[in-house]
Amino acid sequence: MASLQGKPAACEATSLSSCTPGSFGGPVRQTQMGSDMTDRPQQYRFHQGDRVLPFAAEEYDERLDHLRDLMEVQGIDACLFTSMHNVAYYSGFLYCSFGRPYGLVVTATESVTISAGIDASQPWRRCHGDNITYTDWQRDNFWRAVASVTGEDQVIGCEADHLTLVQSEKLSVFLKPTRGVDISAGTMLQRMIKSPAERDLIRHGAAVADVGGFAIRDMIREGVREIDVAMAGRDAMELEIAKRFPDAEYRDTWVWFQSGINTDGAHNPVTSRKLKRGDILSLNTFPMISGYYTALERTLFVGEVDVASQRIWNINVAAHELGISLLVPGAKCSDVTAQLNSFFEEHQVLQYRTFGYGHSFGILSHYYGREAGLELREDIDTVLEPGMVISMEPMLTIPKGQPGAGGYREHDILFITDDGNEDITKYPYGAGFNVVG
């Protein structure tokens, strides 16, 4: 059984009511409603409960050491991370924004998450390092809390691919940096190489995805709705995650289960369409564990598969197997893509391919993250290295009205090893197992 890393910690502030204005740290502001109202702090520290993290403290210390090496090379005094993926990668805390800004400030000596008061002490319990809570009583208290750590007139590293124009202007006003440096590319390169601890978590995730896949397969029969099948897969995965990670927080796990024409797009939402005999199906399970994404994707048919569909399916499965064989150390992403393009062209189906052949894994979801430097596309020349984790997922979409119409996709997760790769996806692909119901 896997477990998250946790240790008891003393409560640094047991209640807000027991503290006088300003006792949490940071300036206070008189409310506009009159002097009889209690002054309210702009920020404070509220630390209580036991700290529980996805990884050991040493894992986060090592990540921060690598980051600080990058900061030193680029002459950065402090980094402000605002994206869910980088805040989680360097601190363990996966925030829930709900319209409020969140961040992580890293200096040469400090690592401090900045969170909203609505979360109370939960961000501290789930982060490595210090935590400051900002209040809603005055607009832009988030930026005042950030400035209390960074100071002014510093070289500030930030994520240009995440910071909005509005927030970028506020950074300039409140931090008054001497220079801003985009550090997003450097942090992405760091995230692309997975530590042993990360690979262990991803291995668990792949196994959970398989559990969801088998639960979905068991539900498939004529007359069942897509939503019914999807819920069965999602519930099975959430129960499995809770069994493997009893101290985790559970959020964001989902299923896309598509049938018939709904299979034409890889990211098409679930509907209430009822399954019919001969339908093409697309099974997609996505367990989320502490912000780490894994996936299983398979083509299936209800009851029977026609000759034209079987031909397209066989071609895509063959491309899938070829692609897996190409994912080895030293291979260039664009070269792998070119070889798979040639294979599809030989079979006269290249025109039915709609996106790349695979991508990196780690802290990402359908609304945060994505390590765009490690994708199997024509415009990515990254060379595969041991420690990288990447998918092989060719897809062909045959338009409605043509023989074999529908979307065909197989998806496995592979660890790049010293001498090849390891496929950690175990759910079978192909017609021998996936013509069901």
PLM region spans:
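Cationic, low-complexity basic patches in intrinsically disordered or flexible, solvent-exposed regions
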Residues: P8
